[in-house]
């Protein structure tokens, strides 16, 4: 069985480019770990940074896998109606949303869990996990932010249903909120992240549901 994945990481994103690279690399590491522990899974992972994807070619890139179920991760800036790469809205409520039919979309991006997520689900995305408001990344602790964000993928790859994996993500934020080694403002930002986490679509989805022959 094969797991098809697409990672969109805006390494040129203002203020968060380095975090997006860290998220991309950590996602790749988790996929490699999954490949080692699950002998029945072949990983087919495509990674696109700011210089490889734009509004015009995104559908062509994703069309390679979107006839079947797949995982797609977005790391960059967002709004209620768009996801941005290199200053360009590459996914919006009127453009390119349709290419994510059959996808579990996982994002670390602001506000994509609002109207854009609804449009994705209406266009047959399997599920969406992201943020209805800000996805904060406190300055100077990108490693902490990345670790929290990856807790969702780690749990999902371990076989947990989507709903439980999202609970683990919220628990990771909760741990940060009560971590006295962090500055008060950092803890408040992570609290906002926790409160903004949203799951839309099929909450019973598991990693096995994304596998294709």
Task: Identify the function of each model-found stretch.
Residues 12-15, 55, 77-81, 110-115, ...:
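Solvent-exposed loop/turn segments at secondary-structure junctions
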Residues 68-69, 102, 125:
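Local beta-strand N-terminus motif with an aromatic residue
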Residues 103-109:
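ADP-ribose/adenylate-binding Rossmann-like module
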Residues 113-213:
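Active-site-proximal C-terminal subdomain of hydrolase catalytic domains
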